[in-house]
Amino acid sequence: MAEEQAYHVSKGLECIKALRENPPNMEEIQEVSNIRDQTYKSSKESGTTGVQEEEITQNIDESHTPTKRSNSVSDVLQEDQRGREDNTAPVEAKDRIEEDTQTGPAVRRYYVYDHCGEKVKGIEDADSLMVPAGPPSNRGFEGREGSLDDSIEDSSEDYSEGNASSNWGYTFGLNPDRAADVSMLMEEELTALLGTGHNAGGQKRDGRTLQFPNSPEGSIGNQACEPIKKGHRREVSLTWNDDRCWIDKWCNPICTQVNWGVIRAKCICGECPPVCDDCKDDPEMQNRIWYETPTRETK
Protein backbone atom coordinates (compact mmCIF):
# COMPACT_ATOMS: atom_id res chain seq x y z
CA MET A 1 0.00 0.00 0.00
CA ALA A 2 2.81 2.43 0.82
CA GLU A 3 4.53 1.88 -2.54
CA GLU A 4 1.25 2.38 -4.39
CA GLN A 5 0.53 5.60 -2.53
CA ALA A 6 4.05 6.88 -3.18
CA TYR A 7 3.61 6.09 -6.88
CA HIS A 8 0.35 8.06 -7.07
CA VAL A 9 1.85 10.99 -5.18
CA SER A 10 4.89 11.16 -7.46
CA LYS A 11 2.70 11.04 -10.55
CA GLY A 12 0.49 13.77 -9.16
CA LEU A 13 3.49 15.99 -8.44
CA GLU A 14 4.79 15.48 -11.97
CA CYS A 15 1.42 16.48 -13.41
CA ILE A 16 1.24 19.57 -11.22
CA LYS A 17 4.78 20.56 -12.22
CA ALA A 18 3.99 20.12 -15.91
CA LEU A 19 0.80 22.16 -15.59
CA ARG A 20 2.68 24.98 -13.87
CA GLU A 21 5.31 25.10 -16.61
CA ASN A 22 2.79 24.93 -19.46
CA PRO A 23 -0.71 25.79 -18.20
CA PRO A 24 -3.43 24.66 -20.63
CA ASN A 25 -6.01 27.06 -21.98
CA MET A 26 -9.75 26.71 -21.46
CA GLU A 27 -10.36 25.26 -24.93
CA GLU A 28 -8.04 22.31 -24.36
CA ILE A 29 -9.52 21.64 -20.92
CA GLN A 30 -13.04 21.63 -22.34
CA GLU A 31 -12.01 19.37 -25.20
CA VAL A 32 -10.34 16.83 -22.92
CA SER A 33 -13.29 16.81 -20.51
CA ASN A 34 -15.72 16.18 -23.36
CA ILE A 35 -13.60 13.30 -24.66
CA ARG A 36 -13.39 11.79 -21.17
CA ASP A 37 -17.15 12.00 -20.69
CA GLN A 38 -17.82 10.42 -24.06
CA THR A 39 -15.42 7.54 -23.46
CA TYR A 40 -16.81 6.94 -19.98
CA LYS A 41 -20.42 6.85 -21.20
CA SER A 42 -19.60 4.60 -24.16
CA SER A 43 -17.63 2.17 -21.98
CA LYS A 44 -20.45 2.09 -19.43
CA GLU A 45 -23.08 1.32 -22.08
CA SER A 46 -21.08 -1.23 -24.10
CA GLY A 47 -19.28 -2.79 -21.11
CA THR A 48 -15.77 -2.41 -22.50
CA THR A 49 -12.86 -3.72 -20.46
CA GLY A 50 -9.96 -1.81 -19.01
CA VAL A 51 -7.74 -2.77 -21.95
CA GLN A 52 -10.09 -1.12 -24.44
CA GLU A 53 -10.26 1.99 -22.27
CA GLU A 54 -6.47 2.19 -22.27
CA GLU A 55 -6.44 1.93 -26.07
CA ILE A 56 -8.93 4.80 -26.28
CA THR A 57 -6.82 6.93 -23.99
CA GLN A 58 -3.71 6.11 -26.01
CA ASN A 59 -5.48 7.28 -29.17
CA ILE A 60 -6.40 10.49 -27.39
CA ASP A 61 -2.78 10.94 -26.34
CA GLU A 62 -1.52 10.38 -29.88
CA SER A 63 -3.93 13.01 -31.21
CA HIS A 64 -2.57 15.54 -28.69
CA THR A 65 1.18 14.80 -28.92
CA PRO A 66 2.35 18.20 -30.28
CA THR A 67 2.41 19.79 -26.83
CA LYS A 68 3.87 18.55 -23.56
CA ARG A 69 0.88 19.69 -21.51
CA SER A 70 -1.47 17.41 -23.45
CA ASN A 71 0.64 14.43 -22.38
CA SER A 72 0.33 15.47 -18.75
CA VAL A 73 -3.46 15.67 -19.03
CA SER A 74 -3.60 12.21 -20.63
CA ASP A 75 -1.60 10.85 -17.70
CA VAL A 76 -4.25 12.22 -15.37
CA LEU A 77 -6.96 10.46 -17.38
CA GLN A 78 -5.09 7.16 -17.25
CA GLU A 79 -4.63 7.40 -13.48
CA ASP A 80 -8.33 8.22 -13.08
CA GLN A 81 -9.39 5.13 -15.03
CA ARG A 82 -6.96 2.94 -13.08
CA GLY A 83 -8.48 4.26 -9.87
CA ARG A 84 -11.93 3.19 -11.10
CA GLU A 85 -10.66 -0.34 -11.71
CA ASP A 86 -9.03 -0.50 -8.26
CA ASN A 87 -12.22 0.65 -6.56
CA THR A 88 -14.20 -2.30 -7.90
CA ALA A 89 -12.38 -4.79 -5.63
CA PRO A 90 -13.65 -3.38 -2.28
CA VAL A 91 -17.21 -3.25 -3.66
CA GLU A 92 -17.08 -6.94 -4.58
CA ALA A 93 -15.64 -7.80 -1.17
CA LYS A 94 -18.44 -5.85 0.52
CA ASP A 95 -21.06 -7.76 -1.51
CA ARG A 96 -19.50 -11.04 -0.41
CA ILE A 97 -19.63 -9.98 3.23
CA GLU A 98 -23.32 -9.07 2.94
CA GLU A 99 -24.10 -12.43 1.32
CA ASP A 100 -22.27 -14.32 4.07
CA THR A 101 -23.93 -12.36 6.89
CA GLN A 102 -27.42 -13.21 5.58
CA THR A 103 -27.07 -16.95 6.17
CA GLY A 104 -29.82 -17.25 8.78
CA PRO A 105 -32.06 -15.14 11.05
CA ALA A 106 -30.64 -16.58 14.30
CA VAL A 107 -26.92 -16.69 13.43
CA ARG A 108 -24.54 -13.81 12.71
CA ARG A 109 -21.33 -14.65 10.86
CA TYR A 110 -18.27 -12.45 10.51
CA TYR A 111 -15.35 -13.01 8.16
CA VAL A 112 -12.10 -11.18 7.60
CA TYR A 113 -11.05 -10.20 4.05
CA ASP A 114 -7.76 -8.83 2.83
CA HIS A 115 -7.41 -5.96 0.35
CA CYS A 116 -7.84 -8.29 -2.63
CA GLY A 117 -11.28 -9.45 -1.46
CA GLU A 118 -10.15 -12.96 -0.52
CA LYS A 119 -11.15 -14.57 2.76
CA VAL A 120 -8.27 -14.77 5.25
CA LYS A 121 -7.94 -18.23 6.82
CA GLY A 122 -6.48 -19.07 10.20
CA ILE A 123 -7.76 -15.98 12.02
CA GLU A 124 -9.90 -16.81 15.05
CA ASP A 125 -11.16 -14.00 17.23
CA ALA A 126 -14.34 -12.93 18.97
CA ASP A 127 -15.99 -11.79 15.74
CA SER A 128 -15.56 -15.22 14.12
CA LEU A 129 -17.79 -16.90 16.71
CA MET A 130 -21.39 -17.76 15.94
CA VAL A 131 -23.68 -15.88 18.31
CA PRO A 132 -27.36 -16.88 18.55
CA ALA A 133 -29.90 -14.09 18.77
CA GLY A 134 -31.82 -15.73 21.64
CA PRO A 135 -31.35 -15.36 25.44
CA PRO A 136 -27.97 -16.25 27.01
CA SER A 137 -27.37 -19.77 28.25
CA ASN A 138 -25.17 -21.19 31.02
CA ARG A 139 -22.76 -22.72 28.53
CA GLY A 140 -20.21 -20.90 26.40
CA PHE A 141 -20.48 -20.88 22.63
CA GLU A 142 -17.96 -22.58 20.43
CA GLY A 143 -16.72 -21.69 16.99
CA ARG A 144 -17.92 -24.97 15.44
CA GLU A 145 -21.16 -25.00 13.48
CA GLY A 146 -22.26 -28.38 14.81
CA SER A 147 -22.24 -27.21 18.41
CA LEU A 148 -24.95 -24.58 17.81
CA ASP A 149 -27.87 -27.01 17.71
CA ASP A 150 -26.57 -28.88 20.74
CA SER A 151 -26.32 -25.68 22.78
CA ILE A 152 -29.90 -24.71 21.86
CA GLU A 153 -31.24 -28.11 22.90
CA ASP A 154 -29.31 -28.05 26.17
CA SER A 155 -30.51 -24.53 26.97
CA SER A 156 -34.14 -25.58 26.52
CA GLU A 157 -33.61 -28.37 29.04
CA ASP A 158 -31.81 -26.13 31.54
CA TYR A 159 -34.56 -23.49 31.57
CA SER A 160 -37.42 -25.91 32.06
CA GLU A 161 -40.06 -25.32 34.74
CA GLY A 162 -39.15 -26.36 38.26
CA ASN A 163 -35.44 -25.91 37.71
CA ALA A 164 -33.55 -23.42 39.89
CA SER A 165 -31.67 -22.04 36.91
CA SER A 166 -34.92 -20.81 35.34
CA ASN A 167 -34.67 -17.78 37.65
CA TRP A 168 -32.96 -15.04 35.66
CA GLY A 169 -30.93 -13.84 38.64
CA TYR A 170 -27.18 -14.15 38.94
CA THR A 171 -25.85 -17.71 39.18
CA PHE A 172 -22.29 -18.80 39.73
CA GLY A 173 -20.59 -20.58 36.88
CA LEU A 174 -22.16 -18.32 34.25
CA ASN A 175 -19.78 -17.72 31.38
CA PRO A 176 -21.01 -14.96 29.03
CA ASP A 177 -19.07 -14.57 25.78
CA ARG A 178 -19.79 -10.96 24.92
CA ALA A 179 -20.38 -7.60 26.57
CA ALA A 180 -24.01 -7.65 25.36
CA ASP A 181 -24.60 -10.87 27.31
CA VAL A 182 -23.11 -9.31 30.45
CA SER A 183 -25.35 -6.23 30.18
CA MET A 184 -28.40 -8.44 29.66
CA LEU A 185 -27.57 -10.45 32.77
CA MET A 186 -27.10 -7.28 34.82
CA GLU A 187 -30.47 -5.93 33.70
CA GLU A 188 -32.18 -9.20 34.60
CA GLU A 189 -30.45 -9.26 37.98
CA LEU A 190 -31.54 -5.71 38.83
CA THR A 191 -35.10 -6.40 37.71
CA ALA A 192 -35.29 -9.51 39.88
CA LEU A 193 -33.84 -7.63 42.87
CA LEU A 194 -36.34 -4.79 42.56
CA GLY A 195 -39.20 -7.25 42.14
CA THR A 196 -38.33 -9.14 45.31
CA GLY A 197 -37.98 -5.88 47.26
CA HIS A 198 -41.46 -4.67 46.25
CA ASN A 199 -43.13 -8.03 46.81
CA ALA A 200 -41.63 -8.73 50.22
CA GLY A 201 -42.15 -5.23 51.60
CA GLY A 202 -39.04 -5.49 53.77
CA GLN A 203 -35.55 -6.95 53.87
CA LYS A 204 -33.85 -9.06 56.51
CA ARG A 205 -30.40 -8.23 57.76
CA ASP A 206 -28.77 -10.31 60.51
CA GLY A 207 -32.06 -11.95 61.46
CA ARG A 208 -33.92 -8.63 61.85
CA THR A 209 -36.51 -7.18 59.51
CA LEU A 210 -36.16 -3.57 58.40
CA GLN A 211 -39.58 -1.94 58.12
CA PHE A 212 -39.93 1.30 56.24
CA PRO A 213 -41.45 3.97 58.55
CA ASN A 214 -44.83 5.45 57.76
CA SER A 215 -45.41 9.17 57.34
CA PRO A 216 -45.60 11.10 60.66
CA GLU A 217 -48.95 12.66 59.73
CA GLY A 218 -50.61 9.27 59.31
CA SER A 219 -49.06 7.94 62.51
CA ILE A 220 -50.19 10.97 64.51
CA GLY A 221 -53.72 10.69 63.16
CA ASN A 222 -53.90 7.11 64.38
CA GLN A 223 -52.82 8.17 67.89
CA ALA A 224 -56.02 10.07 68.63
CA CYS A 225 -56.07 8.94 72.26
CA GLU A 226 -52.77 10.70 72.97
CA PRO A 227 -53.11 14.32 71.84
CA ILE A 228 -50.03 16.49 71.56
CA LYS A 229 -49.59 18.82 74.48
CA LYS A 230 -49.65 22.52 73.79
CA GLY A 231 -46.18 23.91 73.45
CA HIS A 232 -44.64 20.61 72.38
CA ARG A 233 -43.63 19.08 69.12
CA ARG A 234 -43.71 15.39 68.45
CA GLU A 235 -41.04 13.36 66.68
CA VAL A 236 -41.09 9.74 65.56
CA SER A 237 -37.92 7.66 65.42
CA LEU A 238 -37.03 5.07 62.78
CA THR A 239 -39.10 1.91 62.98
CA TRP A 240 -36.76 -1.05 63.48
CA ASN A 241 -37.96 -4.61 64.08
CA ASP A 242 -41.52 -3.41 64.84
CA ASP A 243 -40.30 -1.13 67.68
CA ARG A 244 -41.58 2.46 67.52
CA CYS A 245 -40.25 5.24 69.72
CA TRP A 246 -42.29 8.42 70.20
CA ILE A 247 -40.41 11.44 71.55
CA ASP A 248 -42.00 14.57 73.03
CA LYS A 249 -39.73 17.60 73.08
CA TRP A 250 -40.02 21.20 74.10
CA CYS A 251 -39.08 23.77 71.53
CA ASN A 252 -36.20 25.60 73.21
CA PRO A 253 -37.55 28.63 75.09
CA ILE A 254 -35.36 31.66 75.67
CA CYS A 255 -34.85 30.74 79.32
CA THR A 256 -33.18 27.42 78.52
CA GLN A 257 -29.47 27.38 79.19
CA VAL A 258 -27.35 26.69 76.13
CA ASN A 259 -23.62 26.64 75.56
CA TRP A 260 -21.72 29.12 73.44
CA GLY A 261 -21.78 28.20 69.77
CA VAL A 262 -24.99 26.16 70.03
CA ILE A 263 -27.74 27.17 67.62
CA ARG A 264 -31.12 27.41 69.33
CA ALA A 265 -33.88 25.38 67.69
CA LYS A 266 -36.67 27.45 66.21
CA CYS A 267 -40.31 26.74 67.03
CA ILE A 268 -42.04 25.20 64.04
CA CYS A 269 -45.49 24.77 65.59
CA GLY A 270 -46.01 28.42 66.59
CA GLU A 271 -47.56 27.45 69.95
CA CYS A 272 -44.50 27.06 72.19
CA PRO A 273 -44.31 29.61 75.03
CA PRO A 274 -41.36 32.04 74.95
CA VAL A 275 -40.36 31.03 78.51
CA CYS A 276 -41.13 28.10 80.80
CA ASP A 277 -43.66 28.24 83.63
CA ASP A 278 -40.93 28.61 86.27
CA CYS A 279 -39.34 31.64 84.64
CA LYS A 280 -42.34 33.50 83.23
CA ASP A 281 -42.83 35.51 86.48
CA ASP A 282 -39.11 35.94 87.28
CA PRO A 283 -38.17 39.63 86.98
CA GLU A 284 -34.46 38.76 86.87
CA MET A 285 -34.79 36.63 83.78
CA GLN A 286 -33.43 39.42 81.64
CA ASN A 287 -30.21 39.38 83.69
CA ARG A 288 -29.31 35.72 83.12
CA ILE A 289 -25.56 35.48 82.56
CA TRP A 290 -25.74 33.00 79.68
CA TYR A 291 -27.61 35.45 77.44
CA GLU A 292 -26.51 38.70 75.93
CA THR A 293 -29.99 39.79 74.88
CA PRO A 294 -33.09 37.56 74.88
CA THR A 295 -34.34 39.14 71.65
CA ARG A 296 -31.19 38.13 69.82
CA GLU A 297 -31.60 34.49 70.82
CA THR A 298 -35.19 34.29 69.58
CA LYS A 299 -34.34 35.48 66.05
UniProtKB/Swiss-Prot annotation:
InterPro entries linked: Paramyx_V_Zn-bd (IPR024279), Paramyxo_P/V_N (IPR028243)
Pfam families: Paramyxo_P_V_N, zf-Paramyx-P
Bridged cysteine pairs (disulfide): none
One Gene Ontology term of the molecular function aspect: metal ion binding
Biased composition (Basic and acidic residues): 79-99
A GO biological process held by the record: symbiont-mediated suppression of host JAK-STAT cascade via inhibition of STAT1 activity
Keyword Plastid on entry: no
Sites where the protein binds Zn(2+) 1: 232, 251, 276, 279
Sequence positions that bind Zn(2+) 2: 255, 267, 269, 272
Keywords from the UniProt entry: Host-virus interaction, Inhibition of host innate immune response by virus, Inhibition of host interferon signaling pathway by virus, Inhibition of host MDA5 by virus, Inhibition of host RLR pathway by virus, Inhibition of host STAT1 by virus, Inhibition of host STAT2 by virus, Interferon antiviral system evasion, Metal-binding, Viral immunoevasion, Zinc
Ranges of biased composition (kind: Acidic residues): 148-160
Gene3D superfamilies in the record: 4.10.80.340
Origin: domain of life: Viruses
Annotated stretches, region: Disordered: 30-101, 128-163
Its job: Blocks host interferon signaling.
Protein name in the entry: Non-structural protein V
Source organism (scientific name): Phocine distemper virus
Gene: P/V
